[in-house]
Structure formats: C-alpha cells, structure tokens
Amino acid sequence: MILLFLLYFSSSLWGQSRDVTEYVDSMIGNSDSRWMQFPGPAMPFGMVKLSPDNQGNVWRGGYEYKINQIIGFSHIHSWTMGGLLTMPVTGPLKIKPGEENEPDSGYRSRINHKNEKASLSYYSVLLDDYNIKAELTSTTRTGFQRYTFPKSDSSRILFDLENGSEYPYEVRWASISKVSDYEIEGFSTQSSYDEPTNLLNDYTVYFVARVDKPMKSFGTWVNGYVDTTSSICWGRHDIGAFMNFDTEEGEIIQLKTAISYVSIEQARKNLEVESGGFGWNFDAVRKYAVNEWRKILSTIEIEGGTEEDKRKFYTNLYRSPVGGIKIAHI
C-alpha cells in the first residue's frame, strides 16, 4: 500500500514538473503531410529548416514515414521553397538520389525506424547502406550535423542543389567552389511554380559549408559530368559537389552550414555570428535551441488532460512558429 502511494505521488509530482519541451514530438504528423511539416530540427521562424527527405517531386513531398529510406537532409522546407541537400555516404560515387523501388540506383539509403530519433531541436538516424549515424540540430540561420562514419577510404559528404520537393523547382544558375580544405561556398538561383496562383517563385539561396576535418579531395558534377579535380563549377539543373575523406571506425566529422537570401558574405556572417560561439560543440547548439524553444512553449500552461493530450498540444504549439520563416538577416 505504501509502495503504491509512493509510486502515485512520485509520478504525479513528475507530471507537474515535467519540462514543456519534453512534450514536443516532431515525428507526429509526418505521414501524408505537407512539405512544411517535417521531423527535423528548426528554430521558431527559422530560415534553416534542416530535415530528412525521402521523396521526389510529388505533392505532399518531403518526408514520408511509410518510406524506409532517406535521400538526404535539405535545409529549406518552406512553402514553394527548397534547396541545399547534404548526404554522408561511403563507397562508389553516386550523384543521383535513385528511385524508391531501386534504392541501389542512387545515393539514398535504407533506414530502420527503430534507429531513428526525433525530439525538440534534434534528429538522428542510422543510414543502413553506409553504416553512418547522422545527427542534426540547428540555429535560426545555420545547420549543424554530426556524422559518425565507419572505417573507409571512400567516405564523403554530398551537396546536391537540385532535389525533390512538394513544389518542384528548377536550378536556373548555380555555382559551388572550394574555399579551403575545410570550407566550400556557393549559390543556387531557383524558380518554382505555384499552380494555384499561376505564379513563378524566383529566389537565390547563398550558402557556406564548413567541416571540422580537412577534406582529402573535392569534386563536382554538372548534369551527369563528374570532375574530380575541379575546385569550382557553374551550371544549371543538376549540379552538386562532394568532399572526400578517409575515416576510421567510429570517427566523427561535423558539418556546419549557413544560408542567406542576400549574399555568400551574409551566409558566412550568419555562420560566424550564430554558430561561431559554440565552436564544434554540437550538444551546446542543441541545448541553446531547446532553451530558446522553452521561452515560447512555457508561455502557455495547461491544466488537466492526459500526458498524451499535453504531447499533442505542445507539439501543435511548436508547429505554429516552425511554419513561418525569418527572412531578415543579422
């Protein structure tokens, strides 16, 4: 009897003091949903919305829970807007994502949802085809990824500028260039079509990407042509780049990215201001993001209801500011 009382008392006390951020479940609603609803990390009105994708150019595209694959992690999940997909891989170079019914035809990877985790400002998954663990977090204008690689002399990070989204977009002109053994930069001028309004949405995504380990080599591709010696590429439509590495078993390579709709210089400033103070401390960035969310979520307190009711409420409260986008720059 005493034991039952203590169990009841402790569970009741825990329920009263539970952090509101723990109620957010970003995996809710990721089946047959919209491009703007995704499991990956995002800040309130974040410019960067870093999340896994596993579909091509289809209505309600993006991430579908029923598909046990990942194409990559793209940085933009706003209405009629997409772009800058990254993907850690090993083995022979593949520059196409491939098809769902033929996953070996491209760089996509199979996954098991048992090895997938999503919580506020955090997402992780094991990419089965490569035995790579990918972890994601973000600030308002930057992404932070932590990849745990197997032992391989063909480890790489892909950067694909034209990828599938709910509103298909065309890369009209783009460039990617190597700045140093640790950094690349580029831009992608894109055009997407919104059928209901019969309007074209034109915008340019500028980006900077930085790693914490020097790349062994760098290469690019444009419309199927691969150049393993180039330090810069220009083109339209299918364009991308890759960083090559040698890795030991369990070695971690971290990737920071920042975007801007103004200039490459502004993207680099976004990276320095929002992410520079954290160094390469992934967990510190994640903690900062959760604390920022706590300020918003804790403004509303609810009484009554079950734990499941609270989970649904705070998840929906979280989704509201995620849907918006902060275009203003630092």
Model-derived features: positions:
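Bacterial Sec-dependent N-terminal signal peptides
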Residues: 1-17
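Accessory carbohydrate-recognition regions in carbohydrate-active enzymes
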Residues: 16-330
